[in-house]
A protein has these predicted regions:
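Alpha-helical transmembrane segments and immediately membrane-proximal extracytoplasmic
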Residues: 1-315, 350
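The conserved cystathionine-beta-synthase
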Residues: 314-342, 350, 355-363
C-alpha cells in the first residue's frame, strides 16, 4: 500500500498535477498496492475511497477501480492466482456466540489502541537521524526475533498455523506482543513496510488466543478459524480506521458470506472502543494530526477547490441602507444572505441569513 501510494505521489508531483488530482492518483496507487498484495481488489477500492479520498464520487471511483483491477491482474500474471493465505471458513454462526463476539471486539479495540499509541510514541522520535533510527530498528528486531522468530517476514505462515489451530496459547500471545511491539517500532521510526499485513497477523493470533482462553466458557463450540478471522478483520479495521475496507476484505479472504454479520459486529465494537473510549482515530489520522494536518479541514478545502466560483456566485444583489427598514423591500425578499458593510468603501463585515432574521422575529 505504502509503496503504491508513495510511487503515485512522486509521479504526480513530477507531472505537476493539482492537489485534487494528486490525491486521486495516490488513492489509485494505494488501491493497486492492496489489490496486488492480498488479491483483494474490492477491499483496495473501498480502502482508497474510505481513508484517502474520504468520499464516494464517480470522478474518483472509476480511476481507483481501474487501478485496483490492474494491480490484481498484473500480480496474478507475475505470481499466479494463488493467494498468500487461504481463509476458507464456511461455517455457520449461532446466536449464542454473540457475547463472545462483543467481548472479543472490545479486546481487539484495546489492542488497536495499544498499537496506535505505541506507534505514535516512536513516531515522535523522528528528530533523531535516519541512520540511528534504522539501527535501533534492526538491533531490537533482531534481538526479539532470536526468541520469537515468528515475527520475521510477512507472518502468513504463522497466521495459517493459527487458522488451523496448531499453535499453543503461549506462542500466540508471544507473537501478538512481539509483532505489535516490533511493527509499532519500525513504522513509528519511519521504516514503513506496511500496516495491513502486520495488523492481520496480530489480530489473527490474538483471536486464536482468545478462543483458547474463553472458548470453553461458551455454550457452543467455537471454530478457531472463526475467532482468528474476527481478529484479523477487527484489528485491520480499527488500526487503519477503515471498517468498511476490513469488512470487504473479510468477504474476499474467507469466501464466506456467513462471516459478514459477526465481522460487522466485532469491527463496530473494536472501532467504537478505539474512538469513543480512548479518543483515537487510527494510525494514519493520528500521524497526520501530529504533523499539524487537519485531515477533515483539508478534505473540505479539497472539495471547495473543485468548485468553480461561477457555480456559486450570487447574481441577485440589493443595496440596503444602514438603519433603514428596507429588509422588507421586494429586493430583499429574494435574498437568502444579506451582506453587512460599514460603507461602500469598506469590505464586507459579515452576513445575515434569512434564517437569522426569521428566528430573531420569532417567525
Amino acid at each position: 500500500m505504502h509503496l503504491g501510494a508513495g510511487t503515485a505521489s512522486q509521479l504526480g508531483q513530477w507531472l505537476g498535477l493539482p492537489r485534487n488530482s494528486l490525491r486521486t492518483l495516490v488513492a489509485c496507487g494505494a488501491a493497486a498496492g492492496i489489490s496486488a498484495s492480498f488479491n483483494t481488489p474490492m477491499a483496495g477500492v473501498i480502502f482508497a475511497m474510505e481513508v484517502i479520498l474520504m468520499e464516494y464520487t464517480i470522478v474518483g471511483f472509476i480511476p481507483v477501480i481501474v487501478a485496483s483491477v490492474l494491480g490484481a491482474v498484473i500480480s496474478q500474471l507475475v505470481f499466479g492466482s494463488d493467494i498468500s493465505f487461504d481463509v476458507d471458513t464456511r461455517i455457520g454462526v449461532e446466536v449464542a456466540v454473540i457475547p463472545y463476539m462483543l467481548v472479543a471486539g472490545l479486546i481487539f479495540g484495546i489492542a488497536a489502541v495499544a498499537f496506535t499509541r505505541l506507534h505514535m510514541l516512536f513516531f515522535r522520535l523522528h528528530r533523531y537521524s535516519l541512520l540511528l533510527r534504522f539501527t535501533v530498528i534492526g538491533v531490537v528486531t533482531g534481538l526479539i526475533a532470536v526468541f520469537v522468530p515468528e515475527i520475521m517476514g510477512t507472518g502468513y505462515d504463522t497466521l495459517a498455523d493459527a487458522l488451523n489451530g496448531v499453535l499453543t496459547l503461549e506462542i500466540l500471545l508471544l507473537v501478538v506482543l512481539a509483532k505489535l511491539a516490533v511493527t509499532a517500532l519500525a513504522t513509528g521510526l519511519g521504516m514503513f513496510g506496511g500496516l495491513i499485513g502486520p495488523s492481520l497477523v496480530i489480530g489473527g493470533c490474538l483471536g486464536g488466543a482468545l478462543v483458547l482462553i474463553g472458548g470453553d466458557l461458551m455454550p457452543v463450540a467455537i471454530d478457531p478459524k472463526f475467532s482468528v478471522l474476527l481478529g484479523m478483520v477487527a484489528m485491520m479495521g480499527a488500526v487503519l480506521n477503515a471498517p468498511m475496507a476490513a469488512l470487504v476484505a473479510t468477504l474476499e479472504l474467507s469466501h464466506s458470506p456467513e462471516m459478514i454479520f459477526p465481522s460487522m459486529l466485532t469491527v463496530v465494537v473494536a472501532c467504537l472502543t478505539l474512538k469513543q473510549r480512548f479518543g483515537s482515530e487510527g494510525v494514519f489520522t493520528e500521524q497526520l494530526r501530529h504533523q499539524g494536518h487537519d485531515i477533515l479541514s483539508d478534505h473540505g478545502k479539497g472539495f471547495l477547490s473543485r468548485v468553480g466560483v461561477d457555480s456559486v456566485e450570487i447574481d441577485s444583489l440589493a443595496s440596503l441602507h444602514e438603519a433603514s427598514n428596507r429588509l422588507r423591500s421586494p429586493e430583499a425578499e429574494a435574498l437568502v444572505v444579506v451582506p453587512v458593510i460599514k460603507s461602500e468603501a469598506k469590505p464586507v463585515l459579515g452576513v445575515i441569513t434569512k434564517t437569522n432574521i426569521l428566528n430573531y422575529y420569532g417567525m
